[in-house]
């Protein structure tokens, strides 16, 4: 990192540094190698075993990669020429056809393209002296806001952010931020060559898929740039369509490795909250008549207005993606529902508005009368069906919810198997602690517990009943008791037993910075 700072000091222009030469610096790939900068792991760890290398030889591989880039750099000026140069036709010498080298370049690219944004952010924070905002780190921080505001609104729109995105659109978006022409040419060339052999992210139409756990840092960055452009245009349309003048505009920027509060414009009614994509990208803004929130590829738009107004914004989104991003987007993918009659799925919860009526008899002197009171409550429930579908995709149960064994984990020790199942169960309990009714969550715990028992029985070639009798109390403690210890610190008198007591208590945590993987599958 010190070498990187020294490079920009020598460059003399911190706002528009020359980024392309960084591809030939070993410390860039060392930063990509650092797990602290990559929460989802790096290709320098487990994937090295696939190629027959260990972590000790990674430095030699980096040097070999840089040497080959030096040898081929004059071919990178034109994408069309890539099919004619000498290394495309030979699989043994073509590092672009080697998955390992392409992943190294992808991770290095992900570090480099973030540099201009990081430098602008750091300089902006020093100039404004903006304090950190710790409470906004949690994904759960959005739910108290929804509880307070949504009870007064009429309609909600479920929006799916369109993907995949054409790679050329992504490069054009970056041109507004990065003026290093050689780097942009190399990026365009790399994406085209990446498309030729990799089918994880880029389809046959030269488009990039982002909703995969194997997605690399570079593609997460490209997706965030695309979504930022979408929402920037949306905010622009919102400001020009409102008859009310915006008096303030604040942005709370959440990143995986640093989190800060930023003020952008001196323009009380618009707030934007966001964080890194894979840790649960979360945007929301408010005005007197509309609220918007997004988590990864799913967004909701709620309004006090009429159904006609919501249809207007629906076609605004459709036209935005069709004419600005050249993406054919069907209008039926945006659903408009009445909040009082329909529920919506967002952030792993099934949310709805419940209306409760109560009658009170009042008496004044000899006159008595009845007063009917109607109250509206924001309710969040555990989406049991969605979670069962997620568990079935992860091979913990069948589609109908029948627990099955996990054969891929049978090579682990007994304690390792129990610990993995218990950790998943605790994470789900932690994330869904804000549910008003937790009986559905107990069913999920039961599926995981029995799946754990079946996995152990499969490993030891025994029956499930034998292991339930042998480890029944231990499994119960691992899957249920430990998950309730956090709640006992807050509500010690309310919790008597995991299946009884405060199953209706709703608790929002301020330390959840990412969505559980199983929740995200739904």
Curated annotation (Swiss-Prot):
A molecular function (GO) term: RNA binding
Keyword annotations: Chloroplast, mRNA processing, Plastid, RNA-binding, tRNA processing
Function in brief: Usually encoded in the trnK tRNA gene intron. Probably assists in splicing its own and other chloroplast group II introns.
UniProt record similarity statement: Belongs to the intron maturase 2 family. MatK subfamily.
Coarse class of the protein's main subcellular location: plastid
Any one biological process term the GO annotation gives: RNA splicing
Localization per Swiss-Prot or TrEMBL: Plastid, Chloroplast
Stated name of the protein: Maturase K
InterPro entries xrefs: Domain_X, Maturase_MatK, Maturase_MatK_N
Superkingdom as given in the UniProt entry: Eukaryota
Keyword Plastid: yes
PANTHER family, A to Z: MATURASE K (PTHR34811:SF1)
One GO location term (cellular component): chloroplast
């Amino acid at each position: 990192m010190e070498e990187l700072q020294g490079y920009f000091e020598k460059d003399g222009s911190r706002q528009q540094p020359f980024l392309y030469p960084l591809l030939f610096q070993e410390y860039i790939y060392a930063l990509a190698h650092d797990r602290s900068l990559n929460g989802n792991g790096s290709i320098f760890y487990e994937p090295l075993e696939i190629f027959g290398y260990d972590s000790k030889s990674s430095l030699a591989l980096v040097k070999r990669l840089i040497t080959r880039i030096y040898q081929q750099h004059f071919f990178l000026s034109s994408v069309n020429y890539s099919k004619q140069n000498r290394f495309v036709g030979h699989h043994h010498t073509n590092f672009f056809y080697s998955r390992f080298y392409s992943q190294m370049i992808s991770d290095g690219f992900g570090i480099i393209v973030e540099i201009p944004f990081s430098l602008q952010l750091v300089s902006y924070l020093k100039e404004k002296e903006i304090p950190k905002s710790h409470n906004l780190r949690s994904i759960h921080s959005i739910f108290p806001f929804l509880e307070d505001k949504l009870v007064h609104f009429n309609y909600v729109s479920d929006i799916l952010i369109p993907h995949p995105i054409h790679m050329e659109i992504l490069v054009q978006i970056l041109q507004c931020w990065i003026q290093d022409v050689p780097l942009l040419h190399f990026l365009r060339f790399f994406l085209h060559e990446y498309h030729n052999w990799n089918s994880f992210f880029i389809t046959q139409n030269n488009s990039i898929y982002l909703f995969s756990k194997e997605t690399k840092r570079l593609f997460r960055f490209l997706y965030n740039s695309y979504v930022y452009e979408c929402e920037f245009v949306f905010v622009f349309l919102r400001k020009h369509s409102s008859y009310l003048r915006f008096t303030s505009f604040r942005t709370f920027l959440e990143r995986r490795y640093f989190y800060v509060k930023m003020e952008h414009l001196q323009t009380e009614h618009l707030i934007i909250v966001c964080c890194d994509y894979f840790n649960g990208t979360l945007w929301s803004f408010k005005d007197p008549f509309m609220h918007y929130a997004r988590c990864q590829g799913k967004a909701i738009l709620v309004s006090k207005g009429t159904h006609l107004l919501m249809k207007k914004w629906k076609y605004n989104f459709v036209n935005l993606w069709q004419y600005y991003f050249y993406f054919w987007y069907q209008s039926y993918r945006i659903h408009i529902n009445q909040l009082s009659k329909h529920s919506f799925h967002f952030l792993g919860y099934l949310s709805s508005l419940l209306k409760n009526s109560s009658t009170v008899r009042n008496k004044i002197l000899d006159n008595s009368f009845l007063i009917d009171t109607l109250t509206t409550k924001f309710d969040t429930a555990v989406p049991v069906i969605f979670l069962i579908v997620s568990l079935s995709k992860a091979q913990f149960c069948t589609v109908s919810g029948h627990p099955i064994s996990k054969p891929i984990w049978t090579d682990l020790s007994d304690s390792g198997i129990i610990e993995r199942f218990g950790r998943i169960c605790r994470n789900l309990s932690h994330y869904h602690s804000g549910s008003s009714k937790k009986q559905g969550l107990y069913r999920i715990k039961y599926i995981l517990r029995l799946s754990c028992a079946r996995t152990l029985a499969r490993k030891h070639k025994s029956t499930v009943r034998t292991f339930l009798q042998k480890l029944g109390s231990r499994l119960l403690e691992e899957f249920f008791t430990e998950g309730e210890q956090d709640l006992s610190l807050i509500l010690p008198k309310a919790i008597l037993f995991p299946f009884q007591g405060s199953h209706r208590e709703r608790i929002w945590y301020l330390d959840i910075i990412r969505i559980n993987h199983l929740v995200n599958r739904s």
